Amino acid sequence: AKNIIHRDIKPANIMVSPKGYFKLGDFGVARQQISGTMTVIGSYDFMAPEVYKGMPYDQTADIYSLGMVLYYLANDFKLPFSEIQSSIDRINRRMNGDTEWDWKQKLSSWGIATNIKQKMSEEILYDTVMTACANDPKARYQSATAMKRDLMICMDKICTLEKRKDNWEAAKKK
């Protein structure tokens, strides 16, 4: 819906329809976008820094939260600083610009990428997630449409790599 800020995007609020479409649920704390929205509401682990600080925020706060969901999914269901017990301490570490959560440094240690396609897809997804999760709202995607465009490019590149792999496997069998 246009001009609606969900304010609590997290994995528990994302459902999959019978046809395989992702749907955002639980609009209990959503509200129409009003200039200078400042209410602190949502889940700390997926909350944008400006929301946590009680500063004015807009739709880019939801983009940040979606970026955190993508990070969580790509990082084997772990958030930045998951070893820290307190969600408030975790958000403070993210906001302080601690580079330890820069997942590009962790790509090789995840053990997820077992082939070139996976390595490449992680690198492509990295830029999208880090843009969505920028601490500065002006450095983030300014619309869901812009983020969707980059995610579609990412998917296209991953599918292209998969097709090349399939062609390579077929050629090796000949």
Question: Can you name each region flagged by the protein language model?
Answer:
Residues 1-4:
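Protein kinase catalytic-loop region centered on the HRD/HxD motif
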Residues 38-51:
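Conserved activation segment of eukaryotic-like protein kinases, specifically the C-terminal portion
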Residues 54-59:
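Activation segment
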Residues 62:
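Conserved catalytic-loop aspartate of Hanks-type protein kinases
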Residues 119-133:
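Conserved C-terminal C-lobe helix
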Residues 140:
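Conserved HRD-motif arginine in the catalytic loop of eukaryotic-like protein kinases
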